[in-house]
Amino acid sequence: MSFYNHKEIEPKWQEFWAKNHTFKTGTDAEKPNFYALDMFPYPSGAGLHVGHPEGYTATDILSRYKRAQGYNVLHPMGWDAFGLPAEQYAMDTGNDPADFTAENIANFKRQINALGFSYDWDREVNTTDPNYYKWTQWIFTKLYEKGLAYEAEVPVNWVEELGTAIANEEVLPDGTSERGGYPVVRKPMRQWMLKITAYAERLLNDLEEVDWPESIKDMQRNWIGKSTGANVTFKIKDTDKDFTVFTTRPDTLFGATYAVLAPEHDLVDSITSAEQAEAVAEYKRQASLKSDLARTDLAKDKTGVWTGAYAINPVNGKEIPIWIADYVLASYGTGAIMAVPAHDERDWEFAKQFGLDIIPVLEGGNVEEAPYTEDGAHINSDFLDGLNKEEAIAKMVAWLEENGVGQEKISYRLRDWLFSRQRYWGEPIPIIHWEDGTSTAVPENELPLVLPKTSDIKPSGTGESPLANLTDWLEVVREDGVKGRRETNTMPQWAGSSWYYLRYIDPHNDEKLADEDLLKAWLPVDIYIGGAEHAVLHLLYARFWHKFLYDLGVVPTKEPFQKLFNQGMILGTSYRDSRGALVATDKVEKRDGSFFHMETGEELEQAPAKMSKSLKNVVNPDDVVEQFGADTLRVYEMFMGPLDASIAWSEEGLEGSRKFLDRVYRLLTTKELVAENSGALDKVYNETVKTVTEHIEDLKFNTAIAQLMIFVNAANKEDKLYVDYAKGFVQLIAPFAPHLAEELWQGLANTGQSISYVAWPTYDESKLVESEVEIVVQIKGKVKARLTVAKDLAPAELEKVALADEKVQAEIAGQTVVKVISVPNKLVNIVVK
């Protein structure tokens, strides 16, 4: 019995593709271009898992399909290779993170090649390669020149025991560090910031121009968080000081009964009374120990301290107490709020807790019982009484501007991008700080500023990165003898991934980031496929850098990625006990179709869950390729369900995909192929070409594969197979199962050439309709025969065919036919007596 021998066939074709540079990017000016991009991976020590190939297979199917359609296709792969795990590994082992990273990349590349992806490896990029990060640094120097990169004192998550600051994501909910479990404190430190806020409006508006999932656009809109309102100035009683609050509801100013400053607000120390100084200092200390996330948790208890100072409400001259509370963040808005407890839940709870006034200014509800957060006519509001929300806002803004105590303001939730890390393993920031107090960017002709090699990667202890320990690299002298010190912060991992798609277009250019004509030819990216977890940060940062490069005249488009698609997650199998606790798969046994805990004997419930090392349910693609073959893995992952759905991995499903490929192999290697078309498969073949073509375009790969299965079933019922249909079918399955298709193609075409550039099959519209139909023959109202006849046969012809049928003749023998009623394409009714 013949079957698809993946262990022989797959390596053979992978070698052929590599040797012949089959997937080198086309440069034919007569052809249209298609750019298919994957989110490049961080090369971790764990290697690929089966979730990675889902997105990669999708872009690969599109790339192979477009090549066959006559496109130049750019389908590259590279490595987002700076990152914290490599630095931690280096600190733990004393090994060079570059060596660790290189080993991981080699392993990832081996795994990727084993899956038969049609990448153009001549365009491979690696964010840790100085020839690559020369241009990451170049972009930074341009941002610096334009005033979009600047230094600021910013509170960071400082861990004294680790001698370094850590990212928000590395702080555990209990306020300790993920690594080591040490206390984390908020400490102001000099940091580099990028002024992404300068692009807020464009980042928002240009979302209308791209074909992205609406859910992702909404996440970006919410992150940018545009709101229209007013800035209002509050004077502080008995001082010449004031502070500004931003509010989206200036119409409720008459209901502002207290103000709250962030504990870090510049004014706090200078306005605090002597009696309150101790309480304020202690509260500030406590707040510094909490993360922003913990501080703004809606469910947490309301805490705060009165400063002893009062502000003057500008609309009615009333004195209102100024408090500090940790739910107000210095980094958000102006770091100060006016509180209207009658109409805001958080303000109401705070006011109730501390016995502060609650004055309703909107009609409706009982504000002693609960805040009223609906709209209503204004009350207790002097010149706004009786007005609705829109009218009142407009009137109040006009009043504030007229009286010089406020103005209309558009505000954004978006903050500037904290761009520096106190780490070794990142791109050096190309800035020198001179002893005369000035700073300059490293000149372009001296880029890249190469990350110095060191075997001693340990925190400096001062809050600077380990680069501060490397004095030979650190200290520089200008031609005029002025001494300087290099910037010791490095860039975040986001830097290299914010522009990598541009470098793929021209990866070996030493003179510029990429050639303008090539950028014009390939941008924007036609399809970008990756996980939804990058919905906000990576995609927003890449859009920001792209717009900046557009303003510089480097790139020709406003947006980088025309179409974005998020593949779903491949879930593992997990088991839960009666308490809902997860049980690792190696502690589970299967008996009589049920699952039991090996140690306790308790019956367990099976449920899908995210693959994780702790649950021991991670599936390694190497094992799947070894047992079933790469084509099986590709077909299975595309057939599991819609590309954007999250679906549980199933061994049975994998076996089903393997059986399908074996059936394809048998059909095309054992069925007699003929040059004469009997017409039996005309409809199903043309339907298959049409469906597969349309569904690949729409990324509906599961239904495309289902149609291929329909063709195989139909072809298996025939004694012979028309050779042109056999060839067309192999071309249709090639994007999904390329190794199998190449092997079968050589048997059919015998050209020695790859199937990759053979023109995609077309379908004949006229063959999509049936040429024959089945009709029923009724005698005395009962069905006595079913006949296949030509479609649209005339009633008289239909009658002839029915009466000539042997079965019908036997039924009416010895009887007189009184009447025959013929309905084309449906039935013949014979009345006898």
UniProtKB/Swiss-Prot annotation:
Which GO BP terms apply?
A: leucyl-tRNA aminoacylation
The short motif 'HIGH' region is annotated over 41-52
An example of a Gene Ontology cellular component annotation for this protein is: cytosol
Q: Name one GO molecular function term.
A: aminoacyl-tRNA deacylase activity
Give the EC number(s) under which this enzyme is classified. Answer: 6.1.1.4
Subcellular localization, per the record?
A: Cytoplasm
Quote the catalytic activity from the record: tRNA(Leu) + L-leucine + ATP = L-leucyl-tRNA(Leu) + AMP + diphosphate
Q: What class of enzyme is it?
A: ligase
Motif 'KMSKS' region in this chain: 610-614
- Pfam families, per database record: Anticodon_1, tRNA-synt_1, tRNA-synt_1_2, tRNA-synt_1g
User: What keywords is this UniProt entry annotated with?
Assistant: Aminoacyl-tRNA synthetase, ATP-binding, Cytoplasm, Ligase, Nucleotide-binding, Protein biosynthesis
What residues bind ATP, as annotated? 613
As given in the record, the signal peptide range reads none
The UniProt entry, under SUPFAM superfamilies, shows: Anticodon-binding domain of a subclass of class I aminoacyl-tRNA synthetases, Nucleotidylyl transferase, ValRS/IleRS/LeuRS editing domain
Q: Report the SS bond pairs.
A: none
The UniProt family comment states:
Belongs to the class-I aminoacyl-tRNA synthetase family.
Quote the protein name from its UniProt record.
Leucine--tRNA ligase
Q: Which organism is it from?
A: Streptococcus suis (strain 98HAH33)
> Per UniProt, what is the name of the gene that codes for the protein in this document?
leuS
